Structure formats: structure tokens, C-alpha cells
Amino acid sequence: MRRSLSQSPGRVFYGWWIVTIGCVQDAVKGGLFNTGFTLYFLPVLTELNLSRAATSLPFSLSRLEAALGAPFVGYLIDRFDVRVMLVAGTLLAGLGLILLSLTHSYLLFLLVFIGPLSFGFQAGFNQATLAVVAHWFRRKRGLAMAIVQTGQAIGGVVIFPLVALAVLNLGWRMAAVLSGLVVLMLLPLVLLIRGSPESMGLLPDGERSSGAEPYPTAHGLTPARSDAREFTTREALRTPTFWLLAAFHGLRNVPYAGVTVHLVPLLIWKGLDEPAAAFYVGLTALATVVIRPFTGWLGDRQSKQTIGAVGVLLGAAGLVVLAYGDGAWWALVLFAVLFSFGDGVNSVTWALVGDVFGRAHFATIRGWISMFQSFASMPAAVYTGWVYDRTQSYTQALIVFVICYGPAALVLWLIPHPTRPAPLEVAASRALSAS
């Protein structure tokens, strides 16, 4: 019997509601954690009497924690109800921020930062929501992921200035408490997320009908037959494409990790005061709000590899402007726009992972790539701080990051699409026959 998997005419496809929730999540994470923690850098450095390298260490260790945990978290997301991970991660991140405000030693600060705080944001935010979006969209995957990750930039525009006001007027400890309460307010929203369209009797992209029943996969998800040719994690790991994608994401993320933690100190080094530096951080985020959805939309229509390669080269140009510009407003605006291209294509290249390897094991495969990405970028923030401590300048670090962008573009450009294995349903039937 043929079953129609459809939604009522005129109703918004539920996948777009999930994208909206994911965007809100990313806005909170981006404004309070990814971008927001650059505001904590100097106050923590001063209060705990640390060097810049030591202050950078928690950020680098959090990437080590992310590297070690990413494949496991990805497996859990693929294996169990994603809402379990979303709720657990949100609770850990919110409580972690509150606990951070209670630390009065460097050791405790380290333990809280790399423990509940970083793990919560890893497990319950970006990794989980992008996996869900990969299941809900196929033709519009690039745009959907771009909108979700644009939330980080929106957080930089809307939430980051509020964090700046809180840190400057209330102190970093009270800012951390308020941030934790905001994170906990996300709990009702994440409960509305569903793991796949098939779980609600729908199809990816809101397609109106299907000529055949969906089939269950090993992990209880139900991709449509048109999306049936999927890589398992083991099959993906055996392809050169996987390793090239891992190399690209590692190289691309080194400059991002090294620059964003130090962005406010970098801009102060260029001659700005703290309020002006916070303004330009917000401007960088605003540029990403425009650039990321545009590159996502373009990636669904043109080569994702070409768009990603061009984007990281523009990011490299932005770092050259920052390194050798004189701190004039036009140079900082140009840096904000160009560097945003290097970050903005991230959504396109994660969508490429889904295009190449399919939906069923996306979270686990992405987790493995994230592991290598995190290992590669782990030393970046400490290296940036070490360079400044030694030379009283960030120029040497910025040039190294420019060099990282070049091979990243080349690797992405050359990545081949692997030959996909037999469909899962065929493999399953063969295994059944063999037994």
C-alpha cells in the first residue's frame, strides 16, 4: 500500500520550526560562550594574576575535551532520542556558567570550564541540532544549516553587547550567573525538537508525498527511500574523502579558534578601548548574519566545495588586513567582513558532509570529523597568547593563521565524492540471508 507522507497545505513545514529553535540555541551559545567569553579574558587574567597563555589554556583544553568526546556524543545522538542530549546539555551548560561564577582559583576555573560548561555546550547545542537538521532537510540542507548557525552571529549582535554591559558594570561573575539562567530558559524550547521528519509522518524538505514506505534503520530513524544510500561510520572512515574533510575542518578552524578567544585583546592591541573593541566584535557578528545564509543558499545551488574554498581565502585576506592595517575604522570594517566569510562557509562545508555520507549516521561521522578539528585547533588560543606574551604583538600568530587557510582551501577544492556503498536495506537483507 502506498502511503502519503504529507503536511496540511498552507502549514509551515515543521523542519523550519526546528531550524528556528536551533537558531535561537546557537544565538544563546554564540553570544554567551563562543563570542561572549572573549569579554571574560582580561577580567579573569587580572583577577587571577595570569599570563595570556595561561588564560587561554581553558579554551584550548575545552577543545581537547570536545575532541575526545565528539565521536561518542555523535554516536549517542544517532542512537537515542536527541531530546535527551539536548536537555542534558542545556542543563550542564547553564549550571556550568553559574558554577563558574563561584570559582576563586585557577584550578577550579579550569575544571568547571572544561567539565560541565564545555561538555554541555558540545552535547546539547550545535552538534545535536545540526544532526537533526541533516535529517529534516536534503535539497535545502545548506540553507537550513546556515540559518541555524547564523544564530551564533545573531548572538554576537544581540546578546554579546548585553554580556559586555554586564561584565563592565556588574563584573564577570554576575555576568556568568545571568548567562547561566538564560541558558536554562531554553529547556522548554528544546523539548519541541523531533529527531526526524519520518517520526511525524513527514518527508525531508516538506515534500508532499512518497511512492513507498520509509524503512527503519538500525538506530530507529526512518529516512525516505530516495535517501536510502547511506554510509555507515566505518565505511565513511575508510574513504579518502572523510580524511580530507577532517583535514579541511581542522585547518579552517585553527584561525577561528586562535582569533576569536583573543578578539577583544587583538582589537585593543590595534589601539581601541574595550567598548570600541566590543563594538567591532558585534560588527563581525553582524556581517556573519548576512554572509552565512547567503553562502548556505548559494551552496544548495552551486558547488559547496568552491564556495567553501573561496570563503576561507577571503578569511585569510581579512587576517592580513588585521595584521598590517593601522587600526583605522575602514580596515577594521574590512577585516570584519572578510573574516566573516571564512567563518560563514562553515555551514556549507558541514552540509557537504551530509551530502556525501547521508543522514543515518551524520552525527557520528560529524563527531569524528569534529574530533580531528578540535585536536588541530586545540593549541591555537594558547599559541596566540604565547606569541603576545613573548613579542607584545599578535602579528606572528596572525600570519601563521593566514598560512593555515591556504591549504584548507586547496584540500576542500580537491575533495572527491566517494562511491557510495549498497543501500542499507540491501546490506541488511544480505546479512539476514547469510545468517
Q: Model regions: which residues?
A:
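Helix-to-loop junctions at the C-terminal end of transmembrane segments
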Residues: 69-81, 291-303, 388-389
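C-terminal ends and interior cores of transmembrane alpha-helices
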Residues: 91-104, 314-326
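Cytoplasmic helix-loop-helix junction between adjacent transmembrane helices
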Residues: 114-150, 358
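Hydrophobic core of transmembrane alpha-helices in multi-pass small-molecule transporters
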Residues: 27, 96, 108-124, 250, ...
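Extracytoplasmic gate region of multi-pass secondary transporters
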Residues: 33-41, 234-290
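Interfacial helix-cap and linker-helix signal at transmembrane-aqueous boundaries
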Residues: 44-45, 76-77, 158, 162-170, ...
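C-terminal transmembrane helical hairpin of 12-TM major facilitator-type secondary transporters
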Residues: 256, 276, 282-352
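Helix-loop-helix hairpin linking two adjacent transmembrane segments in secondary transporters
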Residues: 152-200
